[in-house]
Regions:
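Short acidic loop-to-helix transition motifs that present clustered carboxylates
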Residues: 10-15
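Alpha-helical cap/lid subdomain in secreted, periplasmic
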Residues: 16-153
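Serine-esterase "nucleophile elbow" of acetyl-processing enzymes
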Residues: 1-9, 20-27
Length: 153
């Protein structure tokens, strides 16, 4: 079982709710967890709740790989510096959480930068933020090799 905690297709959700972590922890025999909550989480939420969210999942599944993702960069960041700054802050918080966990000795955690997640044109997005079908296809093509590489099977 592959379990992803997605933000992008459930706009406004994925705010590191502990109930979601508990639900993820209850899954029997997962192959991998993908933490893809950054698009809707705020940097302060990642800093305040990220480790606790991780611990709930990790305590239930100590050997299952966990993949941390960044928020993708959108084409409009070329002219919207405020939006780019906000994403930079969220991605930095996600990276800091990952590095903290690594320093604590956590194994089987992985971090993926979003540089080439869905391409660099505006064709992957509707209204500059939600994935189109093409964006979802690019996302799937981008993440699949990593899933195959890191899954526990």
């Amino acid at each position: 079982i592959l379990l992803m905690y997605l933000a992008g297709q459930n706009s406004g959700n994925a705010l590191l709710d502990m109930e979601i972590a508990e639900l993820m922890a209850s899954v029997e025999d997962p192959a991998i967890f993908v933490f893809d909550y950054v698009p809707n989480a705020y940097d302060y939420l990642i800093r305040e709740k990220g480790e606790q969210f991780f611990r709930i999942v990790r305590d239930a599944h100590p050997d299952v790989p966990i993949l941390f993702l960044e928020d993708p960069y959108f084409a409009h960041y070329e002219w919207d510096s405020h939006a780019k700054t906000e994403v930079d802050k969220k991605n930095a918080a996600q990276r800091e959480l990952f590095e903290k966990l690594k320093k604590q000795g956590e194994k089987r955690i992985y971090f993926l930068k979003s540089d080439d997640m869905v391409g660099h044109d505006a064709e992957a997005f509707v209204e500059n933020i939600h994935f189109t079908d093409l964006g979802m296809m690019r996302y799937a093509d981008w993440i699949t090799p990593y899933l195959k590489k890191y899954m526990k099977r």
